[in-house]
Amino acid sequence: MTLQEEIIRQLGVKASIAPQEEIRKTVDFLKAYLRKHSFLKTYVLGISGGQDSTLAGKLAQMAIAELREETSDQAYQFIAVRLPYGVQADEADAQKALAFIMPDQTLTINIKAAVDGQVEALQAAGVEISDFNKGNIKARQRMISQYAIAGQMAGAVIGTDHAAENITGFFTKFGDGGADILPLFRLNKRQGKALLKVLGADAALYEKVPTADLEDQKPGLTDEVALGVTYQDIDDYLEGKLISKVAQATIEKWWHKGQHKRHLPITIFDDFWK
């Protein structure tokens, strides 16, 4: 088995999908998790205005709405959370995503004071924080807020990790990589886009250029520039297609580099890192 085949197997990616079937499968998955854990009544998800959180949010709201209808339990709620650092440059996109999702509840927590306070505390202790490291603090602070909300509202936190993100390790460890449930896992970027099209999302929500936008000194840095490879190449690779040797080498480099992010903390029994 080639490395490409092994990665595809681990991430569960299909070369082609039926969007309606994947939508139904995901909604049923989200419903089943809450039904199994009767002490949970809510899903919590940060909404950025990008493709991934828009899709995960819409599917979560659909699942919650069906649960309420089927059980007559009004305690089931989907809580969308806006988590800007100061003023978000593409706030209009976030609002467009919320209008599409129509969440039961929307909360806004500005993480700037918490992030800046942490950076200042570290600097006071003599630890200088790089702009890149500060970006990771932002990602982790967003999850702190979401878990605080979930803890108060009998909730589970949804993550937006999908195959095209997982293969490159393009997420912050214990930041956006930390969640309770990953409804998009197995889908690549173009497949997620296909689901949003079927769901009737505004094209602007899935055609916009993906960016994590975590670094102050590199505002709007696109994922593809940061990774050095296009999502088209990543998606093709995940669908078992041939791509250029340069693109393949870049993808596989990120796969190896990000292995630690795909595991729980390492124990003496682990050997994947050796």
From Swiss-Prot:
Residues engaged in binding Mg(2+): 52, 165
Catalytic activity as recorded in UniProt: deamido-NAD(+) + NH4(+) + ATP = AMP + diphosphate + NAD(+) + H(+)
The gene coding this protein: nadE
Protein name: NH(3)-dependent NAD(+) synthetase
PANTHER family attached to this UniProt entry: NH 3 /GLUTAMINE-DEPENDENT NAD + SYNTHETASE (PTHR23090), NH(3)-DEPENDENT NAD(+) SYNTHETASE (PTHR23090:SF7)
Entries under SUPFAM superfamilies matching the protein: Adenine nucleotide alpha hydrolases-like
Protein family: Belongs to the NAD synthetase family.
One example of a Gene Ontology biological process annotation: NAD biosynthetic process
Membrane spanning residue stretches: none
Enzyme Commission numbers on file: 6.3.1.5
Molecular function in Gene Ontology: ATP binding; glutaminase activity; metal ion binding; NAD+ synthase (glutamine-hydrolyzing) activity; NAD+ synthase activity
Organism encoding this protein: Streptococcus pyogenes serotype M2 (strain MGAS10270)
Pfam families: NAD_synthase (PF02540)
Protein's pathway: Cofactor biosynthesis; NAD(+) biosynthesis; NAD(+) from deamido-NAD(+) (ammonia route): step 1/1
UniProt GO cellular component terms: cytoplasm
Subunit composition and interactions: Homodimer.
Annotated deamido-NAD(+) binding sites: 140, 173, 180, 260-261
Function of the molecule: Catalyzes the ATP-dependent amidation of deamido-NAD to form NAD. Uses ammonia as a nitrogen source.
Keywords: ATP-binding, Ligase, Magnesium, Metal-binding, NAD, Nucleotide-binding
Keyword Signal: no
Annotated binding of ATP, by residue: 46-53, 160, 189, 211
